[in-house]
């Protein structure tokens, strides 16, 4: 039976998860990001060379499949900045990186709204990273989000983008007294990524299901920490996604099992909670 492990922070992030993930990747077939966006950075130091990744799973330096699943909000410029960085370091990306068709996209208007809101709050600001994560998740919940798969029908994509940015610009101009964004410029820029991102896009839920059913190990890479969870963290000073272990299920898709013996099998066999104390990272395993 495969052992699938989830690594999450037990505090507010920066607990040293990257080190643990790098260690556990060596016994895994796939490493999966299931929530958050490019707001959290995982630092890896390999042979003295430091690399900070915000979107691509830390396992990309190893010979494993790396999955950005549906629970992640995706900023395409950051994704391709990371791909370029890794390629310059001689890291193979092709056939290893897999991105869900269902990832909601982050646009410049999400970032503009994020920063405008923080500015308007003044001394009561939450302290977001200003990268559009919150507004992108707001659109997802409000059923306004544009998904990665929508980009492959240019006409439909531009119609969706026009509606979305009309709403965003209305808020920017009329509520936050900020400048509107150019819809056409954003549309042209994002459509320029279509051919580049297409080789990486797939139904990651089915892909992970096939890996799981082959009894291979899956490593779920949590971002941020438990105390930043939108439901269970120090609300309202939290992030906009669920960061606890349970988020791995909704953030990746259902995992089915086919077995003849009357046994119980779980998607996640172990949870590793990372804790930072006095400049040292510790981790605890729960099965």
Positions of the model-derived regions?
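Non-transmembrane, aqueous-exposed alpha-helical and coiled segments at domain scale
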Residues: 1-256, 260
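Conserved small/polar residues in nucleotide/adenosyl-binding loops
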Residues: 257-268, 277-278
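Short, flexible active-site-adjacent loop segments at beta-strand->alpha-helix junctions, enriched
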Residues: 103, 265, 272
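Hydrophobic alpha-helical segments, chiefly the membrane-spanning helices
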Residues: 269-287
């Amino acid at each position: 039976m495969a052992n699938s492990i989830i690594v999450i922070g037990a505090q507010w992030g920066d607990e040293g998860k990257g080190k643990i993930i790098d260690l556990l990747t060596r016994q895994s077939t796939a490493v999966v990001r299931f929530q958050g966006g490019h707001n959290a950075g995982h630092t890896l130091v390999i042979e003295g060379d430091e690399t900070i990744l915000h979107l691509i799973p830390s396992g990309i330096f190893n010979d494993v499949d790396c999955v950005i699943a549906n629970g992640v909000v995706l900023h395409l410029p950051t994704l391709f900045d990371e791909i370029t960085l890794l390629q310059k370091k001689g890291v193979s990306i092709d056939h290893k990186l897999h991105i869900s068709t269902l990832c909601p996209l982050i646009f410049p208007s999400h970032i503009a709204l994020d920063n405008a809101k923080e500015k308007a709050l003044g001394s009561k600001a939450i302290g977001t990273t200003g990268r559009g994560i919150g507004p992108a998740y707001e659109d997802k919940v409000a059923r306004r989000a544009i998904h990665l798969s929508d980009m492959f029908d240019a006409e439909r994509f531009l119609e969706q983008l026009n509606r979305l940015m009309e709403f965003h610009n209305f808020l920017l101009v009329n509520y936050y007294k900020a400048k509107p964004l150019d819809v056409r410029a954003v549309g042209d820029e994002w459509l320029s990524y279509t051919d580049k991102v297409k080789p990486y896009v797939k139904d990651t839920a089915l892909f992970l299901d096939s890996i799981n059913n082959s009894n291979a190990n899956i490593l779920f890479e949590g971002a941020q920490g438990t105390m930043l969870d939108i439901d269970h963290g120090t609300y309202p000073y939290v992030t906009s996604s669920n960061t606890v272990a349970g988020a791995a299920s909704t953030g990746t898709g259902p995992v089915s099992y086919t077995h003849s013996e009357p046994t119980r099998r779980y998607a996640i066999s172990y949870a590793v909670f990372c804790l930072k104390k006095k400049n040292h990272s510790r981790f605890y395993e729960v099965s």
